């Protein structure tokens, strides 16, 4: 038995129905939140794959630094004019993994070489400025890379890989 006046105004029963439904929705969302949020990667996982920025200004000509990105060592070399000229004078066809120096550096920033510092033979960490080619020398099995990170001698099958990177400014790069 409803009258016209009670249909326009909500009853106490309507209020309790809406309040109970809202409380159940909030409680259900609060109960489900931990299950949904645990599917997201944690902060260390996100940070491990995140791009990193490296300031190049403290690296003197002829020096290298090693940084880590995604758990891998990255060598950043500030090459001298002599190293660049020697790398470009190499007959690319004579290399085990033919690749020109120009293909391994960014145009306009030829003095900077950025490579992943893991030997392509068995995964050892090469030493910078060692070996016969003033590049990288793998102490495990003797692979020798030139100043452009190209394999020149030894059992390694390929050049040191170049990670994805870009110049943010003249003195800063972003790796990743």
Curated annotation (Swiss-Prot):
<feature type="binding site">
    <location>
        <position position="119"/>
    </location>
    <ligand>
        <name>[2Fe-2S] cluster</name>
    </ligand>
</feature>
<keyword id="KW-0813">Transport</keyword>
<dbReference type="GO" id="GO:0005886">
    <property type="term" value="C:plasma membrane"/>
</dbReference>
<dbReference type="InterPro" id="IPR014349">
    <property type="entry name" value="Rieske_Fe-S_prot"/>
</dbReference>
<dbReference type="InterPro" id="IPR019470">
    <property type="entry name" value="Ubiq_cytC_Rdtase_Fe-S_su_TAT"/>
</dbReference>
<keyword id="KW-0249">Electron transport</keyword>
<dbReference type="GO" id="GO:0051537">
    <property type="term" value="F:2 iron, 2 sulfur cluster binding"/>
</dbReference>
<keyword id="KW-1278">Translocase</keyword>
<comment type="subunit">
    <text>The main subunits of complex b-c1 are: cytochrome b, cytochrome c1 and the Rieske protein.</text>
</comment>
<dbReference type="Pfam" id="PF10399">
    <property type="entry name" value="UCR_Fe-S_N"/>
</dbReference>
<dbReference type="InterPro" id="IPR006317">
    <property type="entry name" value="Ubiquinol_cyt_c_Rdtase_Fe-S-su"/>
</dbReference>
<keyword id="KW-0812">Transmembrane</keyword>
<protein>
    <recommendedName>
        <fullName>Ubiquinol-cytochrome c reductase iron-sulfur subunit</fullName>
        <ecNumber>7.1.1.8</ecNumber>
    </recommendedName>
</protein>
<dbReference type="Pfam" id="PF00355">
    <property type="entry name" value="Rieske"/>
</dbReference>
<dbReference type="InterPro" id="IPR006311">
    <property type="entry name" value="TAT_signal"/>
</dbReference>
<keyword id="KW-1133">Transmembrane helix</keyword>
<feature type="transmembrane region" description="Helical">
    <location>
        <begin position="15"/>
        <end position="36"/>
    </location>
</feature>
<keyword id="KW-0408">Iron</keyword>
<keyword id="KW-1015">Disulfide bond</keyword>
<feature type="disulfide bond">
    <location>
        <begin position="124"/>
        <end position="140"/>
    </location>
</feature>
<comment type="similarity">
    <text>Belongs to the Rieske iron-sulfur protein family.</text>
</comment>
<comment type="function">
    <text>Component of the ubiquinol-cytochrome c reductase complex (complex III or cytochrome b-c1 complex), which is a respiratory chain that generates an electrochemical potential coupled to ATP synthesis.</text>
</comment>
<feature type="binding site">
    <location>
        <position position="138"/>
    </location>
    <ligand>
        <name>[2Fe-2S] cluster</name>
    </ligand>
</feature>
<feature type="domain" description="Rieske">
    <location>
        <begin position="87"/>
        <end position="174"/>
    </location>
</feature>
<dbReference type="InterPro" id="IPR017941">
    <property type="entry name" value="Rieske_2Fe-2S"/>
</dbReference>
<keyword id="KW-0479">Metal-binding</keyword>
<keyword id="KW-0001">2Fe-2S</keyword>
<dbReference type="InterPro" id="IPR019546">
    <property type="entry name" value="TAT_signal_bac_arc"/>
</dbReference>
<dbReference type="GO" id="GO:0045275">
    <property type="term" value="C:respiratory chain complex III"/>
</dbReference>
<dbReference type="InterPro" id="IPR036922">
    <property type="entry name" value="Rieske_2Fe-2S_sf"/>
</dbReference>
<dbReference type="GO" id="GO:0008121">
    <property type="term" value="F:ubiquinol-cytochrome-c reductase activity"/>
</dbReference>
<keyword id="KW-1003">Cell membrane</keyword>
<dbReference type="InterPro" id="IPR005805">
    <property type="entry name" value="Rieske_Fe-S_prot_C"/>
</dbReference>
<keyword id="KW-0472">Membrane</keyword>
<dbReference type="GO" id="GO:0046872">
    <property type="term" value="F:metal ion binding"/>
</dbReference>
<keyword id="KW-0411">Iron-sulfur</keyword>
<feature type="binding site">
    <location>
        <position position="141"/>
    </location>
    <ligand>
        <name>[2Fe-2S] cluster</name>
    </ligand>
</feature>
<dbReference type="GO" id="GO:0016491">
    <property type="term" value="F:oxidoreductase activity"/>
</dbReference>
<feature type="binding site">
    <location>
        <position position="121"/>
    </location>
    <ligand>
        <name>[2Fe-2S] cluster</name>
    </ligand>
</feature>
């Amino acid at each position: 038995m409803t009258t016209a006046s009670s249909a326009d105004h909500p009853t106490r029963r309507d209020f309790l129905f809406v309040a109970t439904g809202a409380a159940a929705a909030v409680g259900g969302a609060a109960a489900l939140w931990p299950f949904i949020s645990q599917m997201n990667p944690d902060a260390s996982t996100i940070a491990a794959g995140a791009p990193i920025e490296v300031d190049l200004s403290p690296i003197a000509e002829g020096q290298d630094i090693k940084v880590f990105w995604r758990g891998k060592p990255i060598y950043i070399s500030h090459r001298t004019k002599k190293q660049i000229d020697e790398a470009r004078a190499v007959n690319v066809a004579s290399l085990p993994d033919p690749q020109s120096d120009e293909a391994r550096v960014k145009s306009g920033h030829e003095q900077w070489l950025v490579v992943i510092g893991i030997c392509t033979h068995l995964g050892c960490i090469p030493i910078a400025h060692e070996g016969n080619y003033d590049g990288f020398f793998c102490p495990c099995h003797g692979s020798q890379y030139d100043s452009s990170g190209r394999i020149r001698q030894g059992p390694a099958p390929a050049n040191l890989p170049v990670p994805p990177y870009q110049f943010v400014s003249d003195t800063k790069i972003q790796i990743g």
